């Protein structure tokens, strides 16, 4: 999850500043839709999980996240702010759905006595995953920049190919999630 998920918030401000010529402040504000949509979408995730179940929700949200990451590869200096914001909101909703689902599934079977330790371990794994995802994205971007160049369109293409490459990790996640049983997490759902 973190290989693809952590790459996007790392790559976007770099792309906005280095390739699009935005200021650091503008780049920061452009990331706000990710956080906003993550919070807003949480309201609907319980309903989605109750209807679709954990396996289907996780696979669907991973495919949608891959799609949102691919769509970021289409961004360029002529992209409208509205298009950029819509892409980021789409990504924020996907990330919210994935992380809410996976976190609930991860600690859902722990007893109350184990839940504190489980949450701590989950937090540590997430932090390591964030660092790993950023490192991998950085290496991929560096390789593309060395191969394609650092100026103008070449730099933009390097970012685009990096987004495409990181979307492959989301597709790999779908393969991993396919090993979940359809009934995994059923005890956490409110069935209709």
Residue ranges and their predicted role:
Residues 149-151, 183-192:
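Short, Lys/Arg-enriched, Gly/Pro-containing loop segments at transmembrane-helix junctions
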């Amino acid at each position: 999850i973190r290989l693809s998920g952590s790459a996007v918030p790392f790559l976007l401000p770099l792309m906005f500043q280095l390739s699009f010529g935005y200021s650091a402040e503008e780049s920061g504000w452009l990331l706000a839709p990710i956080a906003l949509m993550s919070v807003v979408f949480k309201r609907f995730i319980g309903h989605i999980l109750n209807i679709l179940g954990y396996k289907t929700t996780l696979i669907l949200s991973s495919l949608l996240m891959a799609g949102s990451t691919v769509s970021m590869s289409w961004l360029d200096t002529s992209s409208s702010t509205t298009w950029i914001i819509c892409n980021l909101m789409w990504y924020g909703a996907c990330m919210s759905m994935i992380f809410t689902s996976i976190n609930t599934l991860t600690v859902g079977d722990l007893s109350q006595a184990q839940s504190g330790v489980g949450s701590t371990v989950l937090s540590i794994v997430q932090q390591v995953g964030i660092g790993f995802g950023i490192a991998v994205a950085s290496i991929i971007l560096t390789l593309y920049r060395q191969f394609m160049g650092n100026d103008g369109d070449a730099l933009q293409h390097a970012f685009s190919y990096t987004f495409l490459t990181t979307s492959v990790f989301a597709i790999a996640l779908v393969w991993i999630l396919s090993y979940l049983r359809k009934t995994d997490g059923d005890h956490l759902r409110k069935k209709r």
